[in-house]
């Protein structure tokens, strides 16, 4: 399945390792799409930018399995290696799955591929903006 939206906090080529390592993207979608995901049992994260679906892929699977990174494609479906900045428009390919763990159950979204529709370059907070601008 494929959904289009606006990317925030995307970790596609390198996993986010703040907690358990995983590839992830917060995808801000329109209200109708958010309601559809919620009706299918998926959580919706309310962000300042709008409702978001969190789509992720854990790096480590059962029995020592290591999952590969999702594909990252440009508009022409060529593989690319870029960092996706917040506000980029993307199309995300995912699959839905059910999970059970320690007596709990739910639904998840496996991040399979991301196609960049309109890239906003990723910028680090390295302080260069201060050097380029006006004096203090």
List each language-model region with its residue ranges:
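A short secondary-structure junction signal
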Residues: 37-40, 102-107, 125-127
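Beta-strand/loop nucleic-acid-binding surfaces
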Residues: 54-79
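Exposed beta-sheet edge/beta-hairpin loop segments within beta-rich domains
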Residues: 71-90, 97-108
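OB-fold/S1-family single-stranded nucleic acid-binding modules
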Residues: 101-122
């Amino acid at each position: 399945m494929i959904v289009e939206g606006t990317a925030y906090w995307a970790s596609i080529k390198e996993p986010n390792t703040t907690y358990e390592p995983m590839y992830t993207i917060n995808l801000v979608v329109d209200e109708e799409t958010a309601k559809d995901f919620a009706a299918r049992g998926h959580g919706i994260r309310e962000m300042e930018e709008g409702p978001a679906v969190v789509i992720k892929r854990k790096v480590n699977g059962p029995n020592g399995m290591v999952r590969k990174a999702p594909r990252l494609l440009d508009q022409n479906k060529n593989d690319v290696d870029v960092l996706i900045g917040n506000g980029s428009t993307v199309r995300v390919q995912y699959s839905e799955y059910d999970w059970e763990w320690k007596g709990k159950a739910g639904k998840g979204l496996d991040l399979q591929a991301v196609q960049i529709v309109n890239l906003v370059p990723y910028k680090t907070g390295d302080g260069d903006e201060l050097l380029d601008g006006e004096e203090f």
